[in-house]
Amino acid sequence: SLLLAYTKKQFLDAYTTTVFDNWAVSVHIDQRNYAVSLFDTAGQNSYEQIRCLSYPHANVFLVCFSLVDKKTLESCRTTWLPEIRKYAGDNVPVMLVGTKNDLLENSESQNVVSEEYAKKVAAEIGCLKYFSCSALTHKGLKLVFDESFLAGVGVKFEEEPPNPCCTIL
């Protein structure tokens, strides 16, 4: 999991997905400290009704796909972005994140997603930015989260919480 790699600085080959995982981290941005909640939700269709409950108060979304599996990028376009916009609206920033960039060097598969194509899809589906990273090597990982925190800090809700915080889903 990308969130496990970021929060615990570890990579598990046999990570078992759950319906809903969350982590809390403290982040220092622009001379302010923020309590950040990070959520990972199950991707199976049968969990949409549960998953959507966490969308309305997210400050930013990371929509992830595998750089070595084009089908996962198409799922971002056909499933994840429409679902996010349906339940969270059009104003919440979305970052498109290509994962497993450590596998690109040794992959000769037709399923590999080029950076150019990923950026094109990100623009087409209305993502604020595109990043690639690796949970295994941590290459690009900090940048993904730093930029996401910065994007999420600017999101305003009708009722602001008393303490500065950011929720990334």
Question: Each predicted region: which residue ranges?
Answer:
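TRAFAC-class small GTPase G-domain
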Residues: 1-158
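Polybasic, Ser/Thr-rich amphipathic helices
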Residues: 162-169
